[in-house]
């Protein structure tokens, strides 16, 4: 299995999906209760697996193995389709990659102090982080696959230790708590939605698996089941250990991962747990960075190929890494602003776009070997949910829905 490309692709999908923000997810669901948190997570997982499988369906019509999503968008919606697909992808991925580079540099800069040495400057750490990890992306999907397998083992070990300390402390009464306000379930949907955003690497995975529909489909199902299981178990541990009143206290005092870790550390009595959580967060940040940059690389490669621009690895490396690196070094605030729209961009690229592509594909190619179950009714239903998810942040901003952490 370790040499299996399908398994490797599943780990890349899982690694891209499980970001450093996963551990703070219980703060988003603090007022919802465990039961409704499970329902929301499973529902959004099913929705985004469905949209991922729509990409598998559409990729059956790709003219070349290395065609990107933007090329498919142009094929079915003309130049406007390519522009929308390319802009939404690159703005989202550049914003995320700049955030990951800044976060990775921050972690690396403080690493020497653990060995009694002087801290590294943040800018130096950012450059080292980008060059070292970026080299695996430049090699291609195979390089990311190899490193992701190693890092994933580290994440599993760290996560298992945290669960080992917390699960024995779970109280059933805490898990039975009802939402403080049922509107919290609606408000949390866009944040949890982005926690299943693996679609940015669809082109890379399809190419890596040689266009095999069955392998592609299996990689999505396995690769998304892993984060779903991790999210559910982590929610079980935190909601089971912390009561609703304790969650409210955290949100009032320190609504961050540190606040959550400190609260659970008090209950478990493990002072080592905070360090393990930091290790997990670091590894999750790295695997997410690798997946996101792979998406940038493939998106730019598809764009350059379309307009007959230089498409070698050197040019792609400069175009992929230079913009987020410059912003991470000199103007991180600009990407913080862009990140505030990440949910909207993710909803468009991960749901609205594949629905539109599948709709046109079914009209023009009615006899394709593989078609996602549900017919056009499922397409319309998923589209309506996508529109609602895109509107929710505005309803929160206008005061019609309560705000949640995240």
Where are these regions (language model features)?
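Hydrophobic alpha-helical segments of multi-pass membrane transport proteins
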Residues: 158-162, 283-295, 317-323, 342-367
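Helix-loop-helix junctions that connect adjacent transmembrane segments
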Residues: 116-128, 142, 149-262, 404
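Membrane-interface "cap" regions at the ends of multi-pass membrane proteins
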Residues: 1-27, 36, 49-53, 64, ...
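Loop-to-transmembrane helix boundary motifs in multi-pass membrane proteins
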Residues: 5-6, 120-130, 222, 226-229, ...
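Transmembrane alpha-helical segments of multi-pass small-molecule transport proteins
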Residues: 8-17, 86-87, 111-140, 153-163, ...
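Hydrophobic transmembrane alpha-helices that form the core helical bundles
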Residues: 50-59, 65-116, 278-303
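TM-loop-TM module centered on a large, flexible mid-protein loop between adjacent transmembrane helices
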Residues: 67-79, 227-286, 306
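A generic transmembrane alpha-helix motif of multi-pass inner-membrane proteins
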Residues: 333-406
């Amino acid at each position: 299995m370790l040499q299996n490309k399908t398994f490797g692709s599943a780990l890349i999908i899982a690694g891209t999906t499980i970001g450093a923000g996963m551990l703070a997810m219980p703060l988003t669901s603090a007022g919802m209760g465990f039961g409704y948190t499970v329902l929301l997570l499973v529902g959004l997982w099913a929705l985004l697996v469905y949209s991922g499988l729509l990409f598998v369906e559409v990729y059956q019509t790709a003219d070349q193995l290395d065609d990107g999503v933007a090329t498919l968008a142009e094929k079915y919606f003309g130049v406007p389709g390519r522009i929308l697909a390319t802009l939404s992808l690159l703005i989202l991925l550049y914003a995320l990659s700049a955030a990951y580079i800044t976060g990775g540099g921050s972690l690396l800069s403080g690493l020497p102090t653990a060995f009694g040495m002087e801290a590294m400057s943040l800018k130096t750490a950012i450059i080292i982080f980008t060059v070292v990890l970026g080299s695996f992306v430049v090699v291609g999907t195979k390089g990311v696959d190899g490193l992701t397998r190693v890092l994933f083992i580290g994440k599993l070990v760290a996560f298992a230790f945290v669960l080992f300390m917390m699960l024995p402390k779970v109280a059933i009464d805490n898990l039975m708590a009802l939402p403080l306000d049922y509107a919290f379930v609606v408000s949390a949907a866009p944040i949890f939605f982005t926690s299943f955003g693996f679609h940015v690497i669809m082109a890379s995975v399809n190419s890596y698996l040689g266009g095999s529909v069955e392998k592609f489909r299996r990689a999505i199902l396995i690769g998304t089941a892993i984060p779903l299981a991790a999210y559910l178990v982590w929610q079980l541990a935190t909601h089971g250990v912390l009561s609703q009143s304790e969650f409210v206290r955290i949100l009032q005092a320190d609504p961050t991962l540190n606040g959550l870790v400190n609260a659970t550390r008090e209950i478990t009595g493990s002072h080592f747990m905070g360090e393990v959580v930091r290790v997990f967060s670091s590894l999750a940040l790295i695997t997410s960075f690798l997946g996101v940059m792979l998406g940038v690389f493939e998106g730019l490669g598809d764009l350059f190929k379309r307009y007959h621009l230089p498409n070698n690895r050197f040019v792609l490396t400069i175009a992929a890494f230079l913009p987020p690196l410059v912003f991470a070094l000199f103007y991180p605030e600009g990407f913080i602003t862009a990140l505030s729209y990440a949910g909207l961009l993710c909803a468009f690229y991960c749901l609205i776009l594949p629905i539109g592509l599948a709709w046109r594909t079914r009209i023009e190619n009615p006899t394709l070997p593989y078609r996602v179950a549900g017919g056009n009714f499922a397409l319309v239903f998923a589209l309506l949910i996508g529109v609602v998810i895109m509107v929710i942040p505005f309803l929160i901003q206008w005061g019609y829905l309560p705000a949640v952490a995240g």
